[in-house]
Swiss-Prot record:
GO terms for molecular function: acetylcholine receptor inhibitor activity; ion channel regulator activity; toxin activity. Disulfide bonds join 63-72, 68-80, 73-90, 78-92. This is Alpha-conotoxin-like Mi20.2. Residues 25-45 form a propeptide. Alpha-conotoxins act on postsynaptic membranes, they bind to the nicotinic acetylcholine receptors (nAChR) and thus inhibit them. Through its two C-terminal domains, this homodimeric protein would bind to two nAChR allosteric sites, located outside the nAChR C-loop of the principal binding face and at the adjacent binding interface in a clockwise direction. This toxin specifically blocks mammalian neuronal nAChR of the alpha-7/CHRNA7, alpha-3-beta-2/CHRNA3-CHRNB2 and alpha-4-beta-2/CHRNA4-CHRNB2 subtypes.
Length: 92
């Protein structure tokens, strides 16, 4: 099969949405890979202050941080950790 015919066949098989306007191939991931991309792009949000939800609570609501998601530790000397089998928590 000549190269031109092969190229036309490939273009017919591939959906047009898999290419950008510049002709570059665009990778369209599933929901899991999209979530990973958002996770990797949100590094600057980790520096926002935590808002304490209720006095005495060990958790506050804040920006999405890499370890604890939408939750964070309300005291500045605490940090988020992951306990195997128990989930996320604060270590002070």
């Amino acid at each position: 099969m000549p190269k031109l015919e092969m190229m036309l066949l490939v273009l017919l098989i591939l959906p047009l949405s898999s290419f950008s306007a510049a002709g570059e191939q665009v990778v369209q991931g599933d929901q899991r890979s999209d979530g990973l991309a958002r996770y990797l792009q949100r590094g600057g949000r980790d520096v926002q202050e935590c808002q304490v939800v209720t006095p005495g609570s060990k958790w506050g609501r804040c920006c999405l941080n890499r370890v604890c998601g939408p939750m964070c530790c309300p005291a500045s000397h605490c940090y988020c950790i992951y306990h195997r089998g128990r989930g996320h928590g604060c270590s002070c």
